Amino acid sequence: MDKETLDLTLEALRDFTSARLPEKKILELDATDEFPIDIVRDMNGPELGIQLLFIPEEFEGMGGGAFDVYRVCEELARVDLGVATGVLATFLGSDPIIFGGTYEQKKKWMTRIGQEGLLMAYGATEPEAGSDLGALRTTASPEVKDGEVVGYRITGNKQWISNGGYADLYCVLAKAPAGPTWFIVEKDADGLSHGKPEDKHGIRASNTATVSLENVYVDVDRMVGGKEGQGLFQAQLVFGYTRLMVAAFGLGAGWAALDRAIPYSTGRIQGGAPLSEKQGYTHKLIIPHAVRLEAGRAYIEETAERIDSEEGTLNTEGAIAKYLSTEAGNGAADASIQALGGYGYTREYFVEKIKRDARITTIYEGTSEIMEMTICRDRWQLHLKTKGSYYHEMAQQIEELQRQNGNVGAHVVGHCLHGLAELLEMARVNRMTRHQHILFRLGELIAFAEGAASLAKRAARAAKGELNEKAQRRFSPEALAAISRIYARDTAMKIVSEGARWMGGLLPESDGGNLGARLRLPEIFRTQEGLIQDMDYVADVLYERDTA
């Protein structure tokens, strides 16, 4: 998809949502716990055709890539995460077919989804099988005729299924004799039923329901890929891509909240001046969250470009993007409630709804804790495989960036990456990863360090005018450089403080004395100079004050 087509798609989406989903309507849907099925179906209709975005051009779709999907998902989340989840369910439900189906299956089902605007549901999760899909209990028993398998009988229960009560098609993961396998099930199949909608904390404009399958028969040509036992492999093929979508949801929700807090603070007078002019307000409740969101954006965009360049599934990168962006979005929404004070706690002012909605992004498509485990498990293997050089080499690459552009905080990121490499080596030598909590905390530090590297690279590209032509351009190159410097400093302090906290207490006394030197503590302390000035500058940018 070219830039012009993406821009037209985003413009059409904004026109549609402003007409059909004004703020009053969104609050009504939230209050009544109503899934706006007509609106969601119309989004798949001729006027907008949002489902065409992810369908390949050869099957009469728009052939959008990961970058296009990220931009659209962020825009959807800015409007309403519940409705966005209904759209995501069709994207997600189609993925096993797109990435694992036979050509004939892709042609048949993708064409139907595009032309008929079918809603889909992704039927993987079960009461006893959430992130651990290997524990699923739904079974698919072969039906044999004349010695050949002609179909399957599927029996089991699925839970937390988005669009579960309204989908036209379900992609269902079930255990066949050769292992977990995806099957395509139509809504009118005998034995298929759904429960009442879940009464949820947030995303109340989405439909989430249990789905039950009791001896549901499907023909053998509904087995995705035409071969049993490929289900978990096919699911793994799309995690990098689908987690990028949820990362974009966190980004959109977080900025939607901050973009309500920022104008509120310009008109709210306290102590004779607007809140927007008080560092105690902006430097706690606004700036840190804007910075973290933009770090998430940098990692999303870098990963999306790599997926579109067919570098591979990038599951770990998808996990980092999701972790950084959804935690940042959830934090920004929470801070926005505080930023509005008592008004923020009331439904009328919207930010409390955004907070309730944003919370799910840290849970669905893999909890933040699963992301921490996934991130550390993969990068730990790279640390071992490279004999400890993986992050030292990444630091050297970033230090080269510092020589090219000394304004984006790349030298600070270099300290972060060298320190991270030392932490991982200490953990190896002292066998600290036998403590699961240490493993998870390392996953967090890895995500922040790689996010800092990605943001520095994005700021440097912006300075050279080399951002992706489809990239979001809210901030000038100068503002991005300041944002990158802030995030690099914050990450450096996080690695030092968290590393000292968790490693220092477990290291032998003989090794504890040089911990500060190995983590580059003196250098990192010196990099904190200028932090307040950079935060002041970013505040001026966000509040559109003179930055000359």
Task: Label the predicted regions.
Residues 46-107, 111-117, 163-169, 293, ...:
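Internal helix-loop-helix
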Residues 409-548:
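C-terminal amphipathic alpha-helical interaction region
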Residues 4, 8-9, 78, 194-294, ...:
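Glycine-rich beta->alpha junctions and the first turn(s) of the following alpha-helix
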Residues 116-124:
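A short, Trp-centered hydrophobic/proline-enriched beta-strand micro-motif
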Residues 25-31, 265-273, 293-324, 337-340, ...:
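C-terminal helix-coil-helix/basic helical segment that borders enzyme active sites and/or dimer interfaces
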Residues 150-194:
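A short core secondary-structure module
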Residues 72, 343-409, 503-548:
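Glycine-rich phosphate/cofactor-binding loops in nucleotide/flavin-utilizing enzymes
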